[in-house]
């Protein structure tokens, strides 16, 4: 469908449309990806300029509250009390609205993969990547886009941050790759759970976060995902390798993903420390 685009542009197109075939079909591959994003999202006559709010209006009686919650999450609030404070609701009411967004597959409730579902470490993220783009970049600039300033907004404020946005999308792509490898039985073990992990590193006495962790009763796989415009170097792998000591599993494996490849020192470090490297071309 996007054969005129390179793999990186295809991934961004996947992110901004949520991978929905109907939305992907709106992308004109005779235009650059930047032109498509401008035309679709940052023009008041664009196909997706009001798509997110229109979808909410179809599903919800009070879309304003849901809009506020999604805006809060897109701006960085992730815990229930943070979201509730940002939108001016009590936590009970906010929790009820979040539940509705989860049922619509717009938001997801996440807890560290090693914790129980009832964990108090629960956070909320926007699951639908098209909604994430809209609430992160379009909604805050809605009035300026209506004034015809979409090209300036995109060029000065959005395009420089697309890489950060794609970091989240890339994590989802890498997670899908792990599930695929699970089906093909090419992982070191068969995971019972796959997800994110965050918590305390007791050795370094600091908070730590790992993009993807797959576990079963006696094994774990720790994965780092990097979307950026330079090769992943050995420093990233050194940190990932040190995170192994946080976990008490008998068998521990490491994997690193990079959209821009790996430096020579990273490749050498990976060989010496049994870390599997996955380039964008391999996915």
Model regions and ranges:
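A cross-kingdom feature that marks ATP-driven nucleic-acid transaction machinery
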Residues: 122-283
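Short amphipathic alpha-helical interaction segments
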Residues: 87-105
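Short, surface-exposed connector motifs at secondary-structure boundaries
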Residues: 5-6, 77-79, 247-252
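Amphipathic alpha-helical "lid/sensor" segments that cap RecA-like P-loop NTPase cores
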Residues: 2-55
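Winged-helix-like regulatory helical subdomains adjacent to P-loop NTPase cores
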Residues: 33-85
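Conserved nucleotide-binding/hydrolysis micro-motifs of P-loop NTPases
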Residues: 21, 31, 114-115, 229, ...
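Short, cationic-aromatic polyanion-contact patches
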Residues: 37-41, 58-63, 79, 109-138
């Amino acid at each position: 469908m996007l054969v005129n685009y390179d793999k990186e542009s295809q991934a961004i197109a996947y992110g901004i449309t949520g991978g929905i075939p109907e939305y992907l079909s709106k992308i004109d591959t005779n235009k650059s990806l930047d032109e498509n994003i401008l035309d679709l999202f940052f023009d008041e006559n664009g196909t997706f300029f009001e798509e997110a709010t229109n979808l909410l209006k179809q599903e919800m009686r009070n879309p304003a509250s849901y809009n506020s919650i999604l805006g809060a999450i897109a701006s960085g609030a992730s815990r229930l009390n943070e979201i509730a404070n940002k939108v001016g609701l009590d936590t009970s009411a906010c929790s009820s609205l979040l539940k509705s967004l989860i049922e619509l597959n717009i938001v997801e409730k996440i807890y560290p993969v090693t914790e129980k579902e009832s964990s108090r470490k629960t956070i909320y993220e926007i699951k639908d990547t098209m909604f994430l783009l809209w609430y992160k970049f379009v909604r805050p600039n809605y009035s300026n886009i209506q004034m015809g300033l979409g090209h300036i907004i995109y060029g000065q404020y959005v395009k420089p941050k697309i890489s950060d946005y794609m970091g989240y999308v890339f994590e989802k792509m890498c997670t899908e790759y792990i599930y695929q490898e699970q089906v093909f039985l090419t992982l070191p073990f068969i995971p019972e759970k796959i997800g994110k992990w965050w918590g305390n590193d007791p050795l370094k006495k600091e908070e730590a976060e790992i993009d993807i962790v797959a576990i079963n009763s006696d094994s774990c796989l720790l994965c780092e995902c990097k979307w950026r415009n330079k090769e992943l170097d050995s420093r990233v792998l050194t940190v990932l390798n040190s995170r192994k000591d946080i976990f008490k599993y008998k068998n521990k494996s490491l994997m690193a993903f990079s959209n821009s490849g790996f430096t020579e020192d990273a490749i050498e470090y990976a060989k010496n420390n049994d870390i599997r490297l996955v380039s964008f071309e391999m996915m």
